[in-house]
Amino acid sequence: MLDGFDVLVMSFAASSVAKEWDLLPSEVGILLSAGLFGMAIGSIWLAPYADKIGRRALVLLCLCVITIGMFASAASSDKTQLAGLRFLTGLGIGGMLAALSALVSEYSNDVRRGMSMSILQSGYPLGAIFGGIVSVYLLQNFGWRSLFFFGGLASAVMIPIAFWKLPESIDFMLLGDKAQHKDKISKLAERMNLIKYEISSTSEKAVRQTYRTLLEAKYRLNTLCIWAGYFCLMFSFYFVVSWTPKLLVDAGLTTVQGVSAGIYLQMGGIIGALILGYLTSRFQVTRLTSLYLLLSVFSMVIYGLANLSLVQLMFCASLMGFFLIGAMIGLYTIAPAIYPASLRVTGIGMAIGLGRIGGILAPFLAGYILESGLHQSQSFIVFAAPLLVASLAIWQIRLSRTLS
């Protein structure tokens, strides 16, 4: 839930920050993109360390980075400081998200993996919904800085909880010195009722993996397709979540109504994610995700072009969230299944990182496109088009039956 709030806190605060500092749309776009840029670097640069030091260690490190970034953001005095601190916070979120995705996937069986990932990633829209509700109260009573302070406080609380309760990945421990981790593995196996779980006495050292490995012949097609899927989906998704509240306010709605649309979008996302997770036990996750991406195009076009009442507007926002966030859950389910344990977080991190680059470009480009005079309704069509590419790319991915 933390990443949902931390990522979107700038979107919730955008109108208030722009008013206080008299910012242009393009400057707001930079602030919205700064955190996403940090997430991209964190996913690409920090995430691979989870394949070296462990998933748990990286999650704890990233939680500390997020906490510092959020508290410092609350004290920022100008747009440059805030952009830099949003970048720092994004570093932590990017590394943590990739490590957690691998950790949950590795603790899930093949039948329930889709639902497990759906539950994990539903924390994002839940955090966004909760954050949106809290933001309405905090903005009205304490100003935009209180949003960042609240986020920092929530992150700080999670550090000791994660330290005491978060387990290390068995898959990761099996890659190193098994004798060193024998007791930990045995205790985890016992907690999971794997009574007959046996540990080989031979040590299987992980083969050194690099980003070049992702493009070897056996991974190349799937790697390129998952990269395209992440980039295009994040490009469209972060336009929607970053700009929808502000565009609605600019169109005449109140700030509360604009934030409410963002909340409805995330609520639809939770339903879409859970339904996709349920269906993955019966249908191929690549096919389901491709269909979700295609239907996302139609939902964005309808939202942009239709002349809707307030109630219809909120319903269509929910529909966009249903398909966009549902498709995102599909990608998070697919990515871990492409790579072996020794390469898994590196592969996931690279895919998420490239996706974040799309997410960086979207809010930034949207600011300049809107300044150029493009109508708000037309902007939804422009940013829906990449989803067609994503749908085709994900359809091409071929997965093995098990998570090796």
Model-derived segments and spans:
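Interfacial helix-cap and linker-helix signal at transmembrane-aqueous boundaries
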Residues: 17-18, 49-50, 134-142, 248-249, ...
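A membrane-interface helix-boundary motif in multi-pass transporters
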Residues: 140-152, 370-385
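Cytoplasmic helix-loop-helix junction between adjacent transmembrane helices
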Residues: 87-122
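Glycine-rich segments within core transmembrane alpha-helices of 12-TM secondary carriers
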Residues: 114-140, 154-155, 352-362
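Central mid-sequence intracellular linker of multi-pass
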Residues: 144-204, 392-404
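Conserved MFS/SLC helix-loop-helix module at the cytosolic interface between two early adjacent transmembrane helices
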Residues: 41-79
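Helix-breaking motifs and short loop linkers at transmembrane-helix boundaries and internal kinks
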Residues: 22, 54, 75-81, 92, ...
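Extracytoplasmic gate region of multi-pass secondary transporters
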Residues: 216-273
